[in-house]
């Protein structure tokens, strides 16, 4: 009984009024905290989802599956939620980068217009293919005729060298040592075999075949790239703005009031920047989403990330 009395004396405060006041103060503070908590959750109902998405984005941004053409990490052991978070994060980054490129190009066009710089080559930012012929520019659809003329000139030159120039140098000038006719005569073979030099013929035929094959490959590459381009914007990624007729400015029309007996000159028309294209004169192509490709998708089998 004495120990029970000690426990009761220790458990309860000696003053009942102080105990009631402290209990009321504690309950009021807990109620206030609950009301504040409910208020914050009502103001921001998506706080939990945002926190989860931000944590998922942080995890996805720090994880790199493909660091280069030779280093690809194994992601087969990832959980399903991790895979979904990484897909969502990377898709969002793709569209954000595309929007940044679109705005940067619009701003670049505005700056070029203000400075009076007109460069049409920047409008066609398509990949160029290096030529197999030295000292020639990269192969595009514009200079394809130049490549045709160059290849035909090389083939004609090789044929003329093997058919006319080489026999003349060999027979009349004695360049090249023993002629092929003397070699055939020394072996007591029919002289009809000496009418064609196999060395010159093989050199000429091989050169013509190699140049023709390479030219066919280059032409096929150009045609394939043309098929990959968007059919609406022709690979530029942008279309002409229909509101300002690709000028970037709108003419403000004001009503003109005629005053009897008055000769007043009309005020010059006022212009303002087009709000549809932001003064660039071009808008985003809705088909390719500024990529210039015929199909913009991660499922496109024609897109090689290591090309």
From Swiss-Prot:
Disruption phenotype: Increased expression levels of ELIP1 and ELIP2, especially upon illumination. Reduced cotyledons greening in deetiolated seedlings. Residues 1-55 form a transit peptide. Ubiquitination at K-58 by UBC19 is essential for nuclear localization. Keywords: Chloroplast, Cytoplasm, Isopeptide bond, Membrane, Nucleus, Plastid, Repeat, Transit peptide, Transmembrane, Transmembrane helix, Ubl conjugation. Its main location: plastid. GO terms for biological process: chloroplast organization; de-etiolation; positive regulation of carotenoid biosynthetic process; protein stabilization; response to light stimulus. There is a cross-link at residue 58 (Glycyl lysine isopeptide (Lys-Gly) (interchain with G-Cter in ubiquitin)). CXXCXXXG motif repeats lie at residues 241-248, 285-292. It is found in: Plastid, Chloroplast membrane; Nucleus; Cytoplasm. CXXCXGXG motif repeats lie at residues 230-237, 274-281. Involved in chromoplast differentiation. Associated with a cellular process that triggers the differentiation of pro-plastids or other non-colored plastids into chromoplasts for carotenoid accumulation. Is associated with carotenoid accumulation in chromoplasts. Functions as a major regulator of the phytoene synthase PSY1 protein level and activity. Modulates carotenoid biosynthesis by means of post-transcriptional regulation of PSY1. Modulates carotenoid biosynthesis in part by up-regulating a series of endogenous carotenogenic genes. Belongs to the orange-like family. Its sequence is related to the DnaJ family but lacks the J domain. The CR-type-like region is similar to CR-type zinc-fingers. PANTHER family: PLASTID TRANSCRIPTIONALLY ACTIVE PROTEIN, PROTEIN ORANGE, CHLOROPLASTIC. Interacts with the phytoene synthase PSY1 in chloroplast. Binds to the eukaryotic release factor eRF1-2. Interacts with the transcription factor TCP14 in the nucleus to repress chloroplast biogenesis in etiolated seedlings. Associates to the E2 ubiquitin-conjugating enzyme UBC19. This is Protein ORANGE, chloroplastic.
């Amino acid at each position: 009984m004495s120990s029970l009395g000690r426990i009761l004396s220790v458990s309860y405060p000696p003053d009942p009024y102080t105990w009631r006041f402290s209990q009321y103060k504690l309950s009021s503070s807990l109620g206030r905290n609950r009301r504040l908590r409910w208020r914050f959750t009502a103001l921001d109902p998506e706080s939990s989802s945002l926190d989860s998405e931000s944590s998922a984005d942080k995890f996805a941004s720090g994880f790199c599956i493909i660091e280069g053409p030779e280093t690809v990490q194994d992601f087969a052991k990832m959980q399903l939620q991790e895979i979904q978070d990484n897909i969502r994060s990377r898709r969002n980054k793709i569209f954000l980068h595309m929007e940044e490129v679109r705005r940067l190009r619009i701003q670049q066009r505005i700056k070029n217009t203000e400075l009076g710089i007109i460069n049409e080559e920047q409008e066609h930012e398509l990949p160029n293919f290096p030529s197999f012929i030295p000292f020639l520019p990269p192969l595009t659809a514009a200079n394809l005729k130049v490549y045709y003329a160059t290849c035909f000139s090389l083939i004609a030159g090789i044929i003329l060298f093997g058919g006319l120039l080489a026999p003349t140098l060999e027979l009349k000038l004695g360049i090249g040592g023993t002629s092929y006719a003397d070699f055939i005569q020394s072996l007591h073979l029919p002289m009809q075999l000496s009418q064609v030099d196999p060395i010159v013929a093989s050199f000429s035929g091989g050169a013509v075949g190699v140049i023709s094959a390479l030219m066919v490959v280059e032409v096929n590459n150009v045609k394939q790239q043309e098929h990959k381009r968007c059919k609406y914007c022709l690979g530029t990624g942008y279309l002409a703005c229909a509101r300002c007729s690709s000028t970037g400015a709108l003419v403000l029309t004001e009503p003109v009031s005629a005053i009897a007996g008055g000769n007043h000159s009309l005020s010059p028309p006022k212009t303002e920047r087009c709000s549809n294209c932001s003064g660039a004169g071009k808008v985003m192509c809705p088909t390719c989403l500024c990529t210039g490709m015929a199909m913009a998708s991660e499922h496109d089998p024609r897109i090689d990330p290591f090309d």
